[in-house]
Amino acid sequence: MAAPAPAGAAASPSPKPQLPSPFAELVKTPSGLEKVVLRGARNCCAEIYLYGGQVTSWKNDNGEELLFLSSKAIFKPPKAIRGGIPICLPQFGTHGNLEQHGFARNRFWSIDNDPPPLPVNPAIKAFVDLILRPAEEDLKIWPHSFEFRLRVALGPSGDLSLTSRIRNTNTDGRPFSYTFAYHTYFFVSDISEVRVEGLETMDYLDNLKAKERFTEQGDAIVFESEVDKVYLAAPSKIAIIDHEKKKTFVVTKEGLPDAVVWNPWDKKAKAMQDFGDAEYKNMLCVEPAAVEKPITLKPGEEWRGRIALSAVPSSYCSGQLDPLKVLHG
């Protein structure tokens, strides 16, 4: 196994990191944590904290926030930030022996000034590359050496993409396995007026019923109570329709076979110290993931998983998406 990173290497970002994009700015927040602000075309923007490598804000050209961030979110390590897009690695949820959702979301990442080449759209100007390597404390609980490179980018039309590359850097010949998720919190106007399309007839594991396996009905998913499901072999595109705002989020995923859908509803919301009692009404998590079948990498192998998020106006006729063919086109 590779030698652990020097003490403190993963505990704080570089003193004066250089940002490769003139459309990215490193800002120190009132909490003392640093974040990168990406500014795209037509006033679109996104914010990414170095703590957790976590996107916490994504705004469209009207300045409208598209991601949910709890008003009670705690910006103090080692607490994870409630909202945005936490990264779950090397374990999703309780699917393993590590802490809930693994440790990547509550470690300090560094700006990656020399990432390996990544095919990109030349029209994308606003982006940042981050990197996470294990510190000694991580190797004690998960004894594997790895490099996790993350690119967050704003497209010319305001879409947001996250590309993860995870490489096994063990030097002792050992493979490792992990589960993963982009724990994406979408901001919605009213959860009772939201429906999700693209997961009809899919098999899922119900985390509220001891991970028992069921098959979804043929209708779009609507929300009337707590939901915590892992949809298996989910399609590459999923649509989240917010009727009240006449807006559709389109989630496109690559390298991530599953999709988690979660809303804690009222009782669990009240039990969380970093979540407002009624905030469940304004959020929905739809999380591209690899949960049922862990990803295994041999030394030197690299995995890539990507999501692209967009928000488009939606019109509805007889409960179907208009001819934009969001799910298929």
From Swiss-Prot:
It catalyses: alpha-D-glucose 6-phosphate = beta-D-glucose 6-phosphate. CDD domains: D-hex-6-P-epi_like. Substrate binds at residues 82, 100, 105, 228. The active site is at 183, 287. Keywords: Isomerase. Pfam families: Aldose_epim. Residues 1-13 have a biased composition (Low complexity). It comes from the Eukaryota. It is an enzyme of class 5 (isomerase). GO terms for molecular function: carbohydrate binding; glucose-6-phosphate 1-epimerase activity. GO terms for biological process: carbohydrate metabolic process. Residues 1-20 are annotated as: Disordered. Its EC number is 5.1.3.15. One of its GO terms (cellular component) is cytoplasm. Belongs to the glucose-6-phosphate 1-epimerase family. This is Putative glucose-6-phosphate 1-epimerase. It comes from Cenchrus ciliaris.
